[in-house]
């Protein structure tokens, strides 16, 4: 797997200060995509053990609230295979330790053009490692960017069809109801100041 870019101290792609990994490769090709330079699977540089280690080191800073994975398309089958071991390393190094407000100490966000349904068994991008990967992710921003639905007031997403899914709450709801994650979606709740005011 290649990566197109790593942004340290990123505040645009998830809550708080984060390290954001932009993987290379996307077959979707959404018109108006903000990162079309990462569509090629050959773009950027190889995602090596040394790069993994540097990202994990960056997450160790107390001011860093977590990792964001975007692209490109993280859920392309090749990229899932390239990411799963790394994401499991991150989750093992930074387990879901709960803060007094109930949030995990370090969160993992993932932006994908797939809907959650497409990542379920029999879905377009379901692979042998999809469940392992989703099991490490806290917030999944799902759905393709649709230029006609672009809305500058939206936080952490570009078009109104995209959802910010709280996968931890969704997993709990799915277990309680005995159904798939896609049928038990719980949306992430933004802070009230952002939820009620345009950006």
Predicted regions and their residues:
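Auxiliary Fe-S-binding modules of radical SAM enzymes
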Residues: 2-12, 60-62, 91-199
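Hydrophobic pocket-lining residues within nucleotide cofactor-binding pockets
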Residues: 26, 74, 145
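Alpha-helix termini
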Residues: 27-29, 38, 84-85, 151, ...
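Basic, gly/Ser/Thr/Pro-rich low-complexity segments located predominantly at protein N termini
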Residues: 30, 76-77, 148, 163
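Ubiquitous "structural anchor" signal
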Residues: 22, 79-80, 151, 166
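Conserved Radical SAM active-site core
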Residues: 1-4, 17, 32-124
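N-terminal pre-triad scaffold of radical SAM enzymes
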Residues: 2-29
């Amino acid at each position: 797997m290649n990566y197109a870019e790593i942004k340290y101290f990123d505040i645009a792609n998830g809550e708080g200060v984060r390290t954001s990994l932009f993987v290379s490769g996307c077959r979707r090709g959404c018109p108006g995509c903000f990162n079309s330079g990462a569509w090629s699977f050959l773009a950027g540089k190889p995602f090596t053990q040394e790069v993994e280690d540097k990202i994990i080191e960056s997450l160790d800073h107390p001011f860093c609230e977590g990792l964001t994975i975007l692209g490109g398309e993280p859920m392309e089958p090749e990229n899932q295979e390239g990411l799963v071991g790394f994401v499991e390393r991150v989750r093992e190094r930074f387990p879901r330790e709960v803060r007094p407000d109930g949030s995990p100490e370090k969160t993992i966000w993932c932006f994908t053009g797939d809907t959650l349904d497409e990542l379920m068994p029999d879905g377009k991008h379901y692979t042998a490692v999809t469940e392992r990967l989703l099991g490490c992710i806290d917030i999944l921003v799902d759905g393709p960017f649709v230029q006609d639905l672009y809305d500058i007031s939206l936080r952490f997403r570009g078009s109104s069809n995209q959802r910010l899914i709280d996968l931890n709450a969704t997993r709990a709801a799915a277990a309680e109801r005995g159904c798939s994650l896609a049928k038990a979606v719980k949306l992430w709740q933004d802070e009230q100041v952002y939820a009620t005011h345009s950006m």
